[in-house]
Amino acid sequence: MIDACDQLKAKLAMSRWARESRAPAFITVGAAGGKRHAHRVEIEDISVATHDPLLAQLRQRLRKLHGAPRDGKKMQVACVFSRESVAAPDTSCAVEGDGTLNCSGYGSVVSVTATFGQCAAGWVIERIASAKTL
């Protein structure tokens, strides 16, 4: 299952389910807003993801509300993210946004959002293809 939504409550529910059921092929996708470099996308455990405010909130809530481990221990939730810093839009662009974590405040680049999705899909396909049983 691929979680590619931007709603924290939904992400939390899916990630909690994946951890508790030990889902073999679950991955959550971080925020692509404000990112410009598709080649910097990575897949790791959420415990080591950086530069992603949405995943940081998810990680914090998994720890606080659902007992996920601290101290650098893996949380058993794979994620797609980029260590690239979020870039605010140029002031000359006159972008109107609500300032939330959705892309409307920062904008998004299709090459980055597509790469996030393709990486998530490829990861799930590889997990399914390499599994002896599901």
Located regions from the model:
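Glycine-rich phosphate/adenylate-binding loop
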Residues: 7-10, 36, 40, 48-134
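ADP-ribose/adenylate-binding Rossmann-like module
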Residues: 2-49
